[in-house]
Amino acid sequence: KRTIVIQGGPGTGKSVLAVNLLMEFINKSLNTCYATKNSAPREAFLSLLTHSDAKKQVNIKQLFRSPFGLSNVPDNTYDCLIVDEAHRLVKKMYGDWNGENQVKECISASLLSIFLLDEDQAVTVNDIGSIAEISKWCRELNSTLKMPAEAKLVSQFRCNGSDAYIQFIDDILQRTEESVTVDLDELNFDFRIFDSAIELREALREKNAINNKSRMVAGYCYDWN
């Protein structure tokens, strides 16, 4: 029984790697499943792989699941369980009456569990998918834990592939202990700080009038989130 942890910041290709691993294991006739708490990537990958063909979706849908309900899955049911966005795992979700801890249940359900995570992307107090939590349950369930250095993803696939942009944002938000010097002339981005929400709205409207591709993103600031 083995567990592998793959780390990577935002935009480093964790989900792309997860789906490629899924296809690789499926082609080897191994009972494999992709699991993530968020339904959006599951639905997106399902649509992409089946080209929205309903008949194909019936067969492929079983390759994608939520960690919800893994408490009812017998031990070692899967040859491999690939857990994307593992930092979003929680102890228990409403309605999962037999659930105890989703990290534990992911490891229990598979001979090989692969966790893809970024601890800095945990966004609520209920998120428990940390390396410490995974290590704890590996010891409890006698699963050999592997965290090879080469399994840490560092290349940036978003933001025009600019690692400097991510460093710049981290520095602005004071997320790093040391200040990072970034040559802004190399960044093809329009970065501004607004003192007025009205000015921000007007700037977005001007941008949106060009090609209708400008949006305000404000996740996890509303009561229903």
Question: For each predicted feature, which ranges?
Answer:
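The conserved Walker
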Residues: P10
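Walker A/P-loop NTP-binding motif
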Residues: L17-N27
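Conserved helicase/translocase motor-coupling segment
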Residues: A18, T124-G129, P148-Q167, Q174-N225
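Conserved glycine(s) of the Walker
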Residues: G13
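Inter-Walker segment of RecA-like/P-loop motor cores
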Residues: T32-C80
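Hydrophobic anchor at the beta1->P-loop junction of P-loop NTPases
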Residues: I6
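Signature of the SF2 helicase/ATPase Hel1-core->accessory helical subdomain module
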Residues: I82-K152
